[in-house]
């Protein structure tokens, strides 16, 4: 019998018949993934080996995904839920007293077993609950939900990291042919180096009908954008123009004064991107079925006058979506796709008001 804290190397090199994981939902996502990568060969090698996972929910993480997959019979785990009302002596009076001494949110998580994310999230909790997760077709780190279709228009939003383990380089591919838009593929890797990232971007973008690519160029993003455009010679890298106090606008890809490859993320562009992303998702104009994006959205919270990942969480995929939110608000993008989502949403809202007044 061995007792150990959960880490990537906790049981490596050992053989166990039963592995019991307590409060697994509270293990950080990156450690949980590394732990299962090392422990599963140990478990699968024995005919009678078992894994038991016991935990109260803690947002949308690896435990949440395993639980949902078990409920939908997408894995071989057996889900067992113990509700507070099944414990003798606990009734509505006990519930009211407990909420009074803690909080509604704590009670929902600890006793109702609700998978709540962080508070003050960009996307409302009620909307996050209704966002359905689909299983992707996996291929070398790229999660694919829809294969490219002829004559469809695709855009790719790219967020670049330094290639260190705590940060991910990521991109998300969107089908922009018509509203609602849809996430059709996503990639993220916390070890890919900026020198190699442009080759992966180019390969996937070409596959998706030579997708238009918009790269966030803060820090090492500029290097990735330059390599993609000038060394690999990928033509559909989007450019932005600086318009003084008006900020950046999406351009047509012609070089000139004030033009730059990619988007520089500033307070202004982030404010527009987050606001538009919220409108798109909550207005059902952007369909996201990727678990990792939804999980990041559940911990993407308000901090001061901005939005960022909650402590211990990441937001690389969400920032790709924020880039797309900014992009979808640009006049040049509407010309490329011939889809004015803001106009559609305004018309639908007006029709709803008129219907209520009728």
Place the predicted regions along the sequence by residue.
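Acidic two-metal-ion nuclease catalytic site recognized across multiple nuclease folds
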Residues: 186, 324-358
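Acidic, Mg2+-coordinating catalytic module of metal-dependent nucleases/exonucleases
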Residues: 305-337
């Amino acid at each position: 019998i061995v007792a150990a804290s959960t880490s990537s190397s906790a049981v490596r090199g050992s053989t166990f018949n039963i592995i019991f994981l307590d409060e697994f939902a509270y293990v950080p996502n990156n450690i949980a993934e590394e732990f299962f990568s090392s422990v599963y060969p140990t478990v699968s090698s024995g005919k009678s080996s078992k894994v038991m996972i016991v935990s109260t929910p803690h947002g949308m993480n690896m435990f949440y995904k395993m639980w949902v997959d078990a409920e939908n019979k997408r894995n071989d785990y057996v889900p067992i839920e113990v509700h507070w009302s099944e414990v003798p002596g606990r009734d509505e009076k006990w519930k009211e007293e407990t909420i009074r001494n803690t909080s509604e949110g704590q009670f929902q998580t600890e006793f109702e077993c609700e998978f709540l994310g962080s508070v003050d999230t960009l996307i409302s909790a009620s909307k996050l609950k209704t966002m359905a997760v689909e299983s992707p077709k996996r291929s070398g780190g790229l999660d694919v939900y829809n294969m490219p279709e002829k004559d469809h228009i695709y855009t790719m939003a790219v967020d670049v990291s330094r290639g260190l383990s705590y940060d991910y380089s990521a991109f998300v591919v969107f089908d922009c042919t018509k509203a609602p838009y849809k996430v059709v593929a996503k990639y993220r890797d916390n070890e890919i180096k900026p020198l190699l990232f442009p080759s992966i971007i180019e390969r996937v973008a070409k596959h998706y009908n030579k997708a238009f690519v918009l790269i966030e160029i803060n820090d090492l993003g500029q290097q990735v954008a330059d390599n993609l455009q000038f060394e690999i010679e990928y033509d559909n890298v989007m450019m932005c123009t600086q318009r003084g106090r008006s900020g950046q606008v999406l351009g047509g890809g012609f070089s000139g004064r004030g033009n730059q490859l990619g988007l520089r993320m500033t307070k202004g562009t982030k404010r527009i991107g987050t606001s538009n992303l919220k409108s798109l998702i909550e207005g059902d104009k952007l369909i996201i079925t990727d678990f990792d994006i939804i999980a990041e959205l559940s911990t993407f919270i308000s901090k001061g006058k901005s939005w960022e990942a909650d402590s211990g969480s990441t937001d690389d995929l969400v920032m790709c979506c924020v880039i797309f939110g900014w992009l979808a608000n640009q006049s040049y993008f509407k010309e490329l796709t011939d889809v004015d989502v803001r106009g559609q949403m305004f018309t639908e809202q007006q029709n709803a008001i008129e219907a209520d007044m009728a």
